[in-house]
Structure formats: C-alpha cells, structure tokens
Amino acid sequence: MQQVFRREGINLYYYSNKTKKFSLDSWYLPQLHLLESKGNKKSKAATDQYFIHPSRTRQERDLTDRKHRPEQQQLQRRVTRWKKEVTTRSRPKETSSTHLPYHGSY
C-alpha cells in the first residue's frame, strides 16, 4: 500500500491503493513533523497542539482548537480588556460637592 499525504486544514489524510480513497489516519498526525521538516521542533509542537481525534465532532474540534490558536487567544484578551474598560467607564463617578454637573444657564 502506497501512501500519498496531503494537508487539508489540520486533518491529515492518506490514500490507500487497496480501497482507492483518502481517509483520515490519526497515527500519522503526531509524526507530521517528520514528514514536513526534519528536526523542526516548532512544527511538532504545533502538530501536537492541533491533534485531532477522529471521534470528536466537528463542533467540539472547532471549539477546542479555536481556543488554542494564538490569534484567537490574543483576540480573547482584547475582548476581556475591552469589557473591563467598558465596565469601568460606565460606572458612575462619586460626585463630590465641589464637582457637580452644571445644569444652570450661562
């Protein structure tokens, strides 16, 4: 059986000559760094991080993988920061007798 590798998103498929079709082979996923680049530790880490178990549903995968993507984490941080800013901004200031909003006519 000859294997042809191709990347499709994060999934890795292999082609079987016997069955004449592509199928997801989870065993090759952790070995992906060996195929892509020899001795590149970064790509191995990335592959392990995005390891997909075939039994997980697509929604579950999307949820967990999205959390781990660096740009997503950055976005999440930005959102929480914005939320904090908004809540602190909208909180009414304690008004002292010296600082009151001016309602009279000039």
From Swiss-Prot:
Region (Disordered): 38-106
Cellular location(s): Mitochondrion
Main location: mitochondrion
Gene Ontology cellular-component terms listed: mitochondrion
Keyword Mitochondrion set for record: yes
Further remark: A stretch of 270 kb of the mitochondrial genome is duplicated within the centromere of chromosome 2 resulting in the duplication of the gene. The expression of this duplicated gene (At2g07673) is not demonstrated.
Protein's name in the database: Uncharacterized mitochondrial protein AtMg01030
